[in-house]
UniProtKB/Swiss-Prot annotation:
Residues 429-582 form the Helicase C-terminal domain. The keyword Nucleus does not apply. This is UvrABC system protein B. It is found in: Cytoplasm. Belongs to the UvrB family. Forms a heterotetramer with UvrA during the search for lesions. Interacts with UvrC in an incision complex. The gene is uvrB.
Length: 671
């Protein structure tokens, strides 16, 4: 059996050794809940990685959003390169659920755009849980939504061993049952091609390898893994297991049973609607449901088949849906990152989904059984959650009530202490902020400013820009990828000040930021609560000169508690440093790191690392260019590379080349 192998050049330091020891002790003692109260920059992920390596248990890591999940995936991947670190998030790039608005008699059809790469990673995650003990799955709240049951899923898998008696046509039929499609021209994921007695199959969960099965008469003569691009054989295999293309694939006999159950419910519902004089609703329901049944009978699936999941999984009415938790082994571990955000998210999902579906059922768009296609309720989630570690700098009330043990990780391995917090009058906040920004820009440090409203952020950005400050702002209209680009540009020094509202909190890792300014800090509410203030102040904790300024006319209870907690942590950190002769060291982190985590992870990560390295080399080379002829020659070379990268569909690398060319053209004009 594979074991977790932690690969790192660091040893636990600061509060980490004690935190790791206590967490391991708690897990082995059977504690159902523990809380790791770890400040920003204290290495919480590293501590959790050490715990996983010591207890040797498969782990589910729950993050509050895709960006943080991707960062954690990247970190765990680097800590456990020889183990199965997987990524399970929603595979929708865009999702519009079906809905009905009675007031305007408007029905909105379900519309979605599925990210093929993330779908592959989800399949890879469940495969890892079913086949391996050394699995770490990084997920979001997506894990509480319905998934095909593992029992049904496993019934559909296809095992092929070398030496098996296997008819070619039978193999092709089984692949079709798994929803694989034959395509001899375009060999892509979840397809197969047949060339005589050689069958090439591209597994649905694979991103790197395809499988070649060679038959001699009706016997499997050879199984090999090969590169689907070059055709090069990577290795010979004694056996291989093919998993279905979708988690919702169902055996034929189960489908037939489900159809009978749906027909019975349809008749009961039609009778109810007609008896209540809802003839339009009855006609609509009958037409839609019979069309779906015909599709299921002929093709094995239909659009919106998840609405019949109760029958497909054989569950009684009202039972919890099968989810990713059903794939977890009994000895699994659950780690909830930024638990003060993640736990309330889990509780919020059920009610919103229920409200929308009840309207669809009432007006004849869906059968009542569609209500069972839902996320888990909070009490159901609590019932299936394994031993849990909450991880947060500001644990919430739920963690306080449930944690059997609270473990503090306040002292950072780098010796860095929490930023000094200062309260200044709100009356002159903008002018005072401008003078503070000028000081920081002079020493090439960055500044974060958080405001209360979008309008305020825009006005402040305009004001600072008018005074010569290189500034940008973040708001809810900016998508995740662009948000990451903005943070990257701030770190690179493309601009010096970033203004935001509620986006400058969890998960922003920016060692270059030395000042956090919180405007109108005395306006009590969600954005100025104790937890929000502590999280925002923590953004300056990775810099040696970190400082936070709260602009307020009075000190609120939230401010007092946030400042008090920051001072308590700061005193403990300074005392530890003095007792152990530690001199604080600033954090220097590669700017490419944030992009590694925040873009969709996968097999192309090596290419991205190479891309970042190439960009660095380009930058060094560009600095050495002097004459206009040298610059012009370099522009031509880069343009050729850019067009080649675009032809190879390497658009991220091509975009970097484009930016380099733009900089060189500016230099050419200045020469």
């Amino acid at each position: 059996m594979s074991e977790f192998q932690l690969v790192t050049r660091f040893d636990p330091a600061g509060d980490q050794p004690e935190a790791i020891r206590l967490m391991v002790e708690g897990i082995e003692a059977g504690l159902s809940h523990q809380t790791l109260l770890g400040v920003t920059g204290s290495g919480k992920t590293f501590s959790i990685a050490n715990v996983i390596a010591q207890v040797q248990r498969p782990t589910l890591v729950l993050a509050p959003n895709k960006t943080l999940a991707a960062q954690l995936y990247g970190e765990f991947k680097s800590f456990f390169p020889n183990n199965a670190v997987e990524y399970f998030v929603s595979y929708y790039d865009y999702y519009q659920p079906e809905a009905y608005v009675p007031s305007s008699d408007t029905f909105i059809e379900k519309d979605a755009s599925i990210n093929d790469h993330i779908e592959q990673m989800r399949l890879s995650a469940t495969k890892a849980l079913l086949e391996r003990k050394d699995a770490i799955i990084v997920t979001t709240v997506s894990c509480i939504y319905g998934l095909g049951s593992p029992e049904t899923y496993l019934k559909m898998v296809l095992h092929v061993d070398r030496g098996d008696k296997l008819d070619q046509r039978a193999l092709v039929r089984r692949l079709a049952d798994l929803q694989y499609t034959r395509n001899d021209m375009d060999f892509a994921r979840a397809t197969f091609r047949v060339r005589g007695d050689v069958i090439d199959i591209y597994p649905a969960e694979s991103d790197l390898e395809a499988i070649r099965i060679e038959l001699f008469d009706d016997e499997v003569e050879s199984i090999s893994a090969f590169d689907p691009l070059t055709g090069e054989v990577i290795r010979k295999l004694p056996r291989f297991t093919f998993y279905p293309k979708s988690h919702y694939v169902t055996p034929r006999e189960t489908l037939l049973d489900a159809i009978e159950g749906i027909k019975v419910e349809l008749q009961e519902r039609l009778e109810y609607l007609r008896n209540n004089n809802k003839l339009v609703e009855a006609q609509r329901l009958e037409q839609r449901t019979r069309f779906d049944l015909e599709m299921i009978l002929e093709l094995g699936y239909c659009n919106g088949i998840e609405n019949y999941s109760r029958y497909l999984s054989g569950r009684p009415a009202g039972a919890a849906p099968p989810t990713l938790y059903d794939y977890l082994p009994a000895d699994a571990l659950l780690v909830i990152d930024e638990s003060h955000v993640s736990v309330p998210q889990v509780g919020a999902m059920y009610k919103g989904d229920r409200s929308r579906k009840e309207t669809l059922v009432e007006y004849g768009f869906r059968l009542p059984s569609a209500l069972d296609n839902r996320p888990m309720r909070f009490d159901e989630w609590e019932g299936v959650s394994p031993q849990t570690i909450f991880v947060s700098a500001t644990p919430g009330n739920y963690e306080a009530e449930h944690a059997g043990r609270v473990i503090e990780q306040v002292v950072r391995p780098t010796g860095l202490v929490d930023p000094q917090v200062e309260v200044r009058p709100a009356l002159t906040q903008v002018d005072d902020l401008l003078s503070e920004i000028t000081k920081r820009v002079a020493v090439e440090e960055r500044v974060l400013v958080t405001t209360l409203t979008k309008r305020m952020a825009e006005d402040l950005t305009d004001y600072l820009a008018d005074h010569g400050v290189r500034v940008r702002y973040l708001h809810s209209d900016i998508d995740t990828v662009e948000r990451v680009e903005i943070i990257r540009d701030l770190r690179l020094g493309t601009f010096d000040v970033l203004v935001g509202i509620n986006l400058l909190r969890e998960g922003l890792d920016m060692p270059e930021v030395s000042l956090v300014a919180i405007l109108d800090a005395d306006k009590e509410g969600f954005l100025r609560s104790e937890r929000s203030l502590i999280q925002t102040i923590g953004r300056a904790a990775r810099n040696l000169n970190g400082r936070a300024i709260l602009y307020a006319d009075r000190i609120t209870g939230s401010m007092e508690r946030a400042i008090g907690e920051t001072e308590r942590r700061r005193d403990k950190q300074i005392a530890f440093n003095l007792a152990n002769g530690i001199t604080p060291k600033g954090v220097f982190k590669d700017v490419a790191d944030i992009m590694e985590g925040a873009t969709v992870p996968g097999s192309r990560s090596k290419k991205r690392k190479g891309m970042a390295k190439a960009a660095e080399e380009n930058a060094k080379y560009e600095a050495e260019l002097r004459s206009p002829s040298e610059i012009t020659k370099r522009i031509r070379q880069l343009e050729e590379k850019m067009y080649q990268l675009a032809r190879d569909l390497e658009f991220e690398a091509a975009a970097q080349m484009r930016d380099e060319i733009a900089k060189l053209r500016e230099r050419l004009l200045a020469v």
